[in-house]
Every structure is written in C-alpha cells, then in structure tokens.
Amino acid sequence: MAEDRLNEYVQKMKVADGMLIGSPVYFGNMTAQTKAFLDRAFYVARANGDMFRLKVGAAVAVNRRAGALDTFNEINKLYLISQMIVPGSSYWNTITALKPGDIATDEEGVRTMRTLGKNMAWLLKKLG
C-alpha cells in the first residue's frame, strides 16, 4: 500500500501564506484525485480551527473543451467556506490544452495566468 502523505501536505499548506491549486478537467470537472485530496485536506483544516483562514488561494483549471468553470468554482468554494481570500484576474483562471505544450497556444489563458500571478503576489505582499 502506498504511503499516505496527506498530513505532510496539510502542514505545508498550513505554513504557506497562499496556495494556488489547479486541476485538469476530466469528464467536465476536476479529477477524482484532486477532489479526494482537497476534500481531505480542507476537512482536516476545518476540524483544526479553520487553519487556512485568511490565507490567499487561487484556483486554476486546464481543459480541452467544457468543465473549466465547474472546476474553478469547486476549488473556489473550498477557499471561500474556509474563510480564505481569493484574488481575481483579467478573466477566469482557465487555460485550454489537450496535450503538454498546448497551453502556450492559448494566448488569452497565458495572459490570465500572468495577471493572476501578479495579483496574487501583490495581495500576499499587502497582507504580509
């Protein structure tokens, strides 16, 4: 059986000022692995005094066609119910790709990610 490293990752999330969590989109939503990880990590955080409260969190979704906004929204729901602060960008934090390297062809998606990075860095600096 594989070693469960959830507690290790939760501790890293606990000490981080912010987190950027993303998922590829499979069958219209985040992957099962991402969903399982997030449900477990955020349950632990909530059960331990809302340990992610007031941290900065950004969601990113990579899709081929549909489901990016569903994935984006599901991650943001976890941030918001955990009392986290979510920075915005110039568009939804999604990027379109089918295979490795394809993201470079989504110019709007790349611009959105750059803006998100700048906005997240600005917010972290202001809160720090």
PLM region spans:
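Glycine-rich phosphate/pyrophosphate-binding loop and the adjoining helix
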Residues: 2-8, 15, 81, 85-128
